[in-house]
Amino acid sequence: CLSRLHDTAADSPAHARPRVLLRFRFFDQVSERRRSEAVVPSVQAVLPRWQLSRQGRRGWLRLNGVVSSAADCRELAEQLWLKHEQLLKTPATPTRLTPQALVAASEPETWRQRYATALTRGIDLVNSGDLHKLVLAVRHRIVLADTFDPLPLLKRLRRQQAGSCRFLWQRHTGDAFFGASPERLLSLRAGWLRSDALAGTAGQGDSGAQLLRSDKDRREHELVVETITDQLRRNGLTPRRRRQPQLARHGNLTHLHTPI
């Protein structure tokens, strides 16, 4: 499929060229709304129809479409111009929405009991040797009073979580997945593949000195490093890593970080 992509603006910078966006899951999972219909695939790939990119003070707008005749080219050019005009008229600052105005109802905080049960089970699994490391997560359901626009929140995350990757995945109306992550899965540049082991987080009031001395966090961090390097070796690569982790700061959070 990628061989069928033809870039009509070959002189555009690398970040403005067509991008195929990928979404990965750890496992195949069933959506709650479609639990009886289908399994959500563990990998999704999308070539966006509209692509807007920016570097510094310059921006690029790209329209991806199917062309089979000269009329198709003309129609795409007109759509591109109309979208350009629409963007110029868009307010620079989105409307501010306070969290209190959005929340209509919140489920009772039964998650505390669920978390306590899972925590007890997790500690038993680690103590028995069945697991070396376990990360728990909590799901909280909130009913919104009005339509929610995630863009202002992403803008706030950009300021609060500088250096993180902000993402928004929305293929269907009313179904969006967004957030900010400091982790990089893989990057490939100039023949070099890079990954990052990011595990172990400093507690409140710790600038990172206590984190570097924490035996627990260092052991958990090393498990993540070993897992990544083992996977790379299984795929025929020869990973290189630092002997000691360093500190990586993302907003108010400080993590142990080992580039690979």
What does each model-identified segment do?
Residues C1, V20-R58, H140-L198, R240-I260:
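Conserved, well-ordered active-site substructure
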Residues L2-R139, N235-T238, R243:
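Non-catalytic accessory segments adjacent to catalytic cores
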Residues D7, D11, D28, D72, ...:
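Acidic-enriched, low-complexity/disordered segments with a strong bias for Aspartate over Glutamate
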Residues R54-L88, A180-P259:
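Cytosolic ligand/metal-binding cores
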Residues P94-R184, H221-V224, I228-Q231, N235, ...:
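Active-site pocket-lining segments that scaffold enzyme catalytic pockets across diverse folds
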